[in-house]
């Protein structure tokens, strides 16, 4: 029943964005891309060491409608934000004040670097993905833009090429890391499955998720995230530097999942950094354990991996905060002593705010939402909860 209502809601959103596009520009869309949001269940910090990431596409989507222009101008209209931008292929440099439009510019530049000839486009964007919650809105927009450009200006554009184009946009023009797990997840996802990103092989693999009798809840802590990017980036950089020191030893394995904590005793780094790198080593092993548990349909084993991961992120990697820990603790209060470890919860993303996810039994969903009323009384602002499902990946209509 929930799937039916979600499908109906998606159809209504598409009708709305198509109608607004025609009203804004006077022409009908020639291509429409629908891209899901995503959240990471485990391993989102392991890309630099060629580890694995386990992610899930969700049924909250970004829709992009486009129609061709006869000039080189790109007109962008965000229905979600009520904002308009006008850019030209002659001037696509990054400008801080352009904010979300920089994602579009980066993908256009990446296409041009690939030798594609582009004309201008009229673009209308409607995003249902909660903003500023770490659920992949910027990369959803980039993937959507790459898909519609491919539909209109490339004879064929396989998904692997879309991955390369968006990664190039991120690394060269937005000066971030590739965000490979984000891109592969939303491109290759299937309803009812998680996506494992193998950063070493640059591949995605589906892993069925047993959702019967369960509810998946994302809870946005609404903690102001102005410190999250800077603090998380600095912390991860120190871990990358420590890992690079380990790799200088020719006897050390290349993949983090094969790196033993004992190897870190041989390098000269502060104890805090050593502790965080060891937590990432354990996280990498945990991803493999979680996937094996899902394949065996052993949700109790999967839940144990998830709950221990949050403990490591809180105590060893130190990227949690009181608000996130409170949300996780409320979810875990529904663990049944007679059937332990069938409820799990963890922060997802950069930490220092953002979201938690919880996988609850059907009967625990409404009581969990009721407990969120206490959150505002304790912290002074409301949390926002979203029930989600494993979604299909991106598509072009």
Swiss-Prot record:
Similarity section: Belongs to the GHMP kinase family. GalK subfamily.
Protein's cellular compartments: Cytoplasm
Organism of derivation: Treponema pallidum (strain Nichols)
Top EC category: transferase
Catalytic reaction list: alpha-D-galactose + ATP = alpha-D-galactose 1-phosphate + ADP + H(+)
An example Gene Ontology biological process: galactose metabolic process
Pfam family, one: GHMP_kinases_N
Annotated site location: Transition state stabilizer: 38
Coiled coil: none
GO molecular function, one term: metal ion binding
Record carries keyword Kinase: yes
Name listed for the protein in its UniProt record: Putative galactokinase
Residue positions binding ATP: 78
InterPro entries in the cross-refs: GalKase_N, GHMP_kinase_C_dom, GHMP_kinase_C_sf, GHMP_kinase_N_dom, Mevalonate/galactokinase, Ribosomal_Su5_D2-typ_SF, Ribsml_uS5_D2-typ_fold_subgr
Pathway(s) it belongs to: Carbohydrate metabolism; galactose metabolism
């Amino acid at each position: 029943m929930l799937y039916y209502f979600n499908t109906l809601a998606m159809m209504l959103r598409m009708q709305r964005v198509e109608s607004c596009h025609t009203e804004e520009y006077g022409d009908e869309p020639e291509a429409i891309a629908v891209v899901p949001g995503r959240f990471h269940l485990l391993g989102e910090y392991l890309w630099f060491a060629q580890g694995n990431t386990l992610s899930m596409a969700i049924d909250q989507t970004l829709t992009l409608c486009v129609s061709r222009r006869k000039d080189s101008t790109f007109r962008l209209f965000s229905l979600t934000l009520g904002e308009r931008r006008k850019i030209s292929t002659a001037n696509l440099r990054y400008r801080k004040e352009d904010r979300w439009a920089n994602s579009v510019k980066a993908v256009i530049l990446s296409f041009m670097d690939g030798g594609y000839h582009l004309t201008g486009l009229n673009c209308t964007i409607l995003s249902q993905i909660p903003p500023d919650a770490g659920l992949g809105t910027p990369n959803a927009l980039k993937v959507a833009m790459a898909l519609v450009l491919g539909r209109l200006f490339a004879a064929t554009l396989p998904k692997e090429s879309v991955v390369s184009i968006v990664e190039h946009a991120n690394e060269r023009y937005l000066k971030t890391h590739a965000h490979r797990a984000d891109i592969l997840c939303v491109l290759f996802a299937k309803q009812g499955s998680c996506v494992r990103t193998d950063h070493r092989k640059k591949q995605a693999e589906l892993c069925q998720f047993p959702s019967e009798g369960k509810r998946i809840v994302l809870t946005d802590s609404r903690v102001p995230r102005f410190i999250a990017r800077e603090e998380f980036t600095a912390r991860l950089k120190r871990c990358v530097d420590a890992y690079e020191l380990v790799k200088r030893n020719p006897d050390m394995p290349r993949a983090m999942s094969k790196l033993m904590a004992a190897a870190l005793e041989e390098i000269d780094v502060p104890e805090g950094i050593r502790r965080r790198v060891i937590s990432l080593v354990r996280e990498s092993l945990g991803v493999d354990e979680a996937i094996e548990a899902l394949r065996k349909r052993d949700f109790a084993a999967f839940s144990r991996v998830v709950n221990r991961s949050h403990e490591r992120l809180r105590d060893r990697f130190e990227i949690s905060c009181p608000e996130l820990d409170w949300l996780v603790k409320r979810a875990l209060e529904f663990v049944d002593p007679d059937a332990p470890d069938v409820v799990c919860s963890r922060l997802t993303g950069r930490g220092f705010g953002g979201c938690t996810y919880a996988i609850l039994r059907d009967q625990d969903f409404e009581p969990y939402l009721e407990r969120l009323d206490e959150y505002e009384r304790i912290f002074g602002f409301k949390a926002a909860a979203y029930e989600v499902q494993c979604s299909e990946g991106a598509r072009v209509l």
